[in-house]
Amino acid sequence: INTLIRYFGEYKKRNSDKIPDIKLVLIGGGEVNIPDTIKNDVIDLGFVDIQDKYDACAGAICLCQPSKNESFSIVIMESWLTERPVLVHSQCNVTSDFARESNSGLYFDNYFEFEGCLNYYIDNPQTASQMGHSGRQFVLDNFKWDVVLKKFMDFLEL
């Protein structure tokens, strides 16, 4: 989260003319230290009900999951179900592989790649929308209950 907040602050400084009203919306628990310079541009909602989470994802440019240590990211799947693309850290094999395999997200290794990816989504809303749609299809094709159950049964050869 610290990387995301730091990168967002830098993005605001460098791109204030491009999209001056951009906000970072945080959902979930935990203490977050938000620098005074961007306090007005970061909205920390804390825990919210499921519909509010889906609504927030659906209204976002993208979902950013900067963790390098995810084993499986439910929030990425939820974002894809709302047809929004994702932005993930390239050093997280699981999330970057999901983004590549599904053609539903971009990945970054440093601030300048983060900025480039975010600008790509902003400058190409139709492509971002198509990527989000691909993400939804990826989730439905691979993680719906009947699909998971069939994979499990096939694995057990039942």
Language model features with spans:
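C-terminal alpha-helical cap of glycosyltransferases
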Residues: W145-L158
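Short hydrophobic beta-strand element within catalytic cores of glycosyltransferases
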Residues: P85-H89
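A conserved mid-protein helix/loop that constitutes part of the nucleotide-sugar donor-binding site
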Residues: I1-K12
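Conserved acidic donor-binding segment of nucleotide-sugar-dependent glycosyltransferases
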Residues: E101-F112, Y120-P125
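Nucleotide-activated donor-binding/catalytic signature segment of Leloir-type glycosyltransferases, i.e.
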Residues: I19, N33-Y54
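Aromatic "clamp/platform" in nucleotide-sugar-dependent glycosyltransferases that forms part
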Residues: K68
